[in-house]
Amino acid sequence: MLRLTVKHGLRANSQLAATRNPDASSYVQQLESEWEGAKPFTELPGPTRWQLFRGFQKGGEYHQLGMDDVMRLYKKQFGDICLIPGLFGMPSTVFTFNVETFEKVYRTEGQWPVRGGAEPVIHYRNKRKDEFFKNCMGLFGNGAEWGKNRSAVNPVLMQHRNVAIYLKPMQRVNRQFVNRIREIRDKESQEVPGDFMNTINHLTFESVATVALDRELGLLREANPPPEASKLFKNIEVLMDSFFDLGVRPSLYRYIPTPTYKKFSRAMDEIFDTCSMYVNQAIERIDRKSSQGDSNDHKSVLEQLLQIDRKLAVVMAMDMLMGGVDTTSTAISGILLNLAKNPEKQQRLREEVLSKLTSLHSEFTVEDMKSLPYLRAVIKESLRLYPVTFGNARSAGADVVLDGYRIPKGTKLLMTNSFLLKDDRLYPRAKEFIPERWLRRKDDDKSDVLMNKDLNAFIYLPFGFGPRMCVGKRIVDLEMELTVANLVRNFHIEYNYSTEKPYKCRFLYKPNIPLKFKFTDLKY
């Protein structure tokens, strides 16, 4: 299918598209024909503003429900598509549960796709009195300004050689994580405390910091970590905890500074101050090395960003920390749960990992990481069963018809794919953890078919799609692969408790059960 860039709606550009490309002409005509025969936007099913507001209050049907449960109710009440009206300055949003509409949205999103979900961050950055973020909203921005910033950071963060230089620093952080597990687990039961998610968060925070700030911060290594590192970590937690109340639930923060927004704003202020301090320290280190003639052919991500623009380096450090800690931690926790509950899969993974290492203390090389297909399959399957978020947000890049309804350009959309990932019609035995479904099959393989051959690729997009694909994907991949590989080569992992409803969904999925994993040292 063709990718269209529509500047002022489909009908405004149809003649231009037809002139340039006959295939584009037929596609535009198809969309125009759909539009003429579609139902008007005003007929979309959905609750009224009052029903929605009342539903989120005490005693309402949505009160205290996770976002995934709210969406289940929407789907049950209204079907595959519905309009959720905006409250208190929030834009109305079309929720769609149909993968065919996902593809149409992505294929017509335009040169600079508009993504929602970060309105509280944008609001804060626009309101700062010093206007630091003017013309530099970072990863949370939209439009031409976002396109300019993204074009600047893509060559830095998406190139393999830049990711490879973090192999050793991340392995060092991983060794600290393994040592930390041995310190905090119970000597008799070998189980870690129920708040083990905090330790995983420390791991991902330190891993991101090695890239974003070009340094370790000491949360895993030191019993009493530096206060500025602890404060930065706590403020990231406050930020993420505020997103649901500010970005999903009805909130007046756009008009008056609510208590939640005040807390959010203070956290953002302190994140900015701390990241600026660390970036300034990095500049001093770089200048000192340069004056001493200590040059390095492989400049760090932070050094490369500083060469582009200091402001961009600070903003990207903030955005990587805000976007790369909770998401990766949730992914790692899900992988561990799946491996703990499927010991035969864990053993197969361990055998693959050990086949690349000469000893327990050997370090992975870049070549090693390229030749671990089962490890990557384990991660893919886990992200299918336990996704990090419930879907992807966009604004319609053109006038389109979704499920028979006219959706005007600019309409906010939420493509909710998390339910589809567990649909047996799409993934046979969908509720089972089967990494093998992601491995290439030989032509003569007669084993069970574990993947629908007609599967639409737009169902499974854990890192997004197109120009707005996660800019840190390669770094996150490396982080997850190293963490899981190091854990299975050091420990046999068990989880001896119920995993019923293991995650709750607010803005992101988070563990809903105590992560009391049992880590038993392996003997070699």
UniProtKB/Swiss-Prot annotation:
Highest taxon above the source species: Eukaryota
Annotated PROSITE patterns: CYTOCHROME_P450 (PS00086)
Cofactor: heme
Manganese is among the record's keywords: no
Top-level EC class as recorded in UniProt: oxidoreductase
CDD domains, sorted: CYP24A1-like
Record-listed heme binding positions: 470
One cellular-component annotation, GO: mitochondrial membrane
Gene Ontology molecular function: any one: monooxygenase activity
E.C. number(s) listed in UniProt: 1.14.-.-
UniProt KW keywords: Heme, Iron, Membrane, Metal-binding, Mitochondrion, Monooxygenase, Oxidoreductase, Transit peptide
InterPro entries: CYP11_CYP27_families, Cyt_P450, Cyt_P450_CS, Cyt_P450_E_grp-I, Cyt_P450_sf
Primary localisation category: mitochondrion
Location in or out of the cell: Mitochondrion membrane
Keyword Transferase among UniProt keywords: no
Gene3D superfamilies hit by this protein: Cytochrome P450
Family per record: Belongs to the cytochrome P450 family.
PANTHER family: CYTOCHROME P450
Protein name: Probable cytochrome P450 12c1, mitochondrial
